[in-house]
């Protein structure tokens, strides 16, 4: 077992994306505080990073059998190394990461931050990974709850309360997650069929899946508009994210008919979802700085 093995086990890309979201939530909340507590920010980043990393390790352990079947995941470290020694060491690694993560979060002296992190962890591992992913077409909805936790954790580390801003972040990020995940399940549908994982598009069809995606994008857009209407973000934020969301809607509804190819359309929707969530995080971070300067 090399350092590279342990690094790959935490799914660094997923960890990085979630930490960027946590930082954007933290910075958004600072526009009410008018200053940034860099020590608390550091504790939040370290703690959240380690807990998310432990979640990814445990997910790798739980999914190692289906990961070995799917083309998209067959090269993950535990899919290639499924003997008991690798699994045992990975479990110990996850426990260490998780313990250190909550110790750092304890240094924030914010019980709400710790509670939200615990909820995100338990939902992702206990409900999504261990149960619903293999059993239900609605697993994506459950996964979106844990996926939306990082920005709320960052926000509440500053605000110490689940106010309207926190709930709007929850709505925006969770409803972004659904069309993002559905895009993957559409253009990787053969993988999911091969691993016998039920997905919404396989069971209900592409037409209904696309309608769900459009509705989620609309709710995502309305949540971002509400952030500006209620004074959490600027009109510059509103203009940029609204234009991007409208293009996402256009691609979801009209370009589906133009492309006449489910896989090409789903890949385009997936790429757009990455561009939009990255832009959202950048805009939330920069907007909060410009507001109090």
Curated annotation (Swiss-Prot):
Transmembrane feature ranges: 9-29, 38-58, 86-106, 111-131, 137-157, 167-187, 211-231, 234-254, 271-291
First-listed, main subcellular location of the protein, grouped into a coarse class: membrane
PROSITE patterns assigned to the protein according to its UniProt record, in alphabetical order: UBIA
Catalytic activity: heme b + (2E,6E)-farnesyl diphosphate + H2O = Fe(II)-heme o + diphosphate
GO BP annotations listed: heme O biosynthetic process
Keyword Membrane: yes
One Pfam family recorded for the sequence: UbiA
Pathway, per record: Porphyrin-containing compound metabolism; heme O biosynthesis; heme O from protoheme: step 1/1
Keywords per UniProt: Cell inner membrane, Cell membrane, Heme biosynthesis, Membrane, Transferase, Transmembrane, Transmembrane helix
GO molecular function, one term: protoheme IX farnesyltransferase activity
Note: Carbon 2 of the heme B porphyrin ring is defined according to the Fischer nomenclature.
Role of this protein: Converts heme B (protoheme IX) to heme O by substitution of the vinyl group on carbon 2 of heme B porphyrin ring with a hydroxyethyl farnesyl side group.
NCBIfam families in alphabetical order: cyoE_ctaB, PRK04375.1-1
Protein name per the record: Protoheme IX farnesyltransferase
Gene: cyoE
């Amino acid at each position: 077992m090399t350092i590279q093995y342990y690094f790959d086990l935490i799914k660094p890309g997923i960890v990085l994306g979630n930490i960027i979201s946590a930082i954007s939530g933290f910075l958004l909340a600072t526009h009410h505080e008018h200053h940034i507590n860099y020590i608390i920010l550091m504790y939040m980043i370290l703690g959240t990073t380690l807990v998310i990393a432990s979640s990814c390790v445990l997910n790798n352990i739980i999914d190692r059998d289906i990961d070995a079947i799917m083309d998209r995941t067959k090269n993950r470290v535990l899919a290639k190394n499924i003997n008991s020694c690798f699994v045992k060491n990975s479990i110990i690694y996850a426990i260490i990461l998780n313990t250190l993560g909550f110790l750092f979060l304890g240094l924030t002296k914010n019980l709400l931050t710790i509670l939200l992190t615990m909820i995100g962890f338990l939902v992702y591992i206990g409900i999504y990974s261990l149960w619903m992913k293999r059993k239900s077409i609605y697993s994506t909805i459950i996964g979106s709850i844990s996926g939306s936790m990082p920005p709320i954790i960052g926000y509440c580390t500053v605000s110490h309360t689940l106010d309207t801003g926190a709930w709007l972040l929850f709505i925006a990020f969770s409803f972004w997650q659904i069309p993002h995940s559905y895009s993957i399940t559409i253009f990787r549908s053969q993988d999911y069929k091969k691993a016998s994982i039920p997905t919404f598009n396989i069971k209900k069809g592409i037409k209904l899946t696309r309608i769900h995606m459009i509705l989620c994008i609309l709710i995502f857009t309305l949540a971002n508009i509400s952030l500006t209407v209620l004074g959490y973000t600027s009109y510059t934020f509103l203009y940029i994210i609204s234009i991007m969301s409208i293009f996402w809607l256009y691609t979801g509804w009209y370009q589906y008919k133009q492309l006449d190819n489910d896989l090409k359309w789903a890949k385009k929707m997936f790429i757009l979802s990455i561009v939009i969530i990255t832009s959202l995080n950048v805009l939330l971070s920069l907007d909060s700085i410009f507001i109090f300067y």
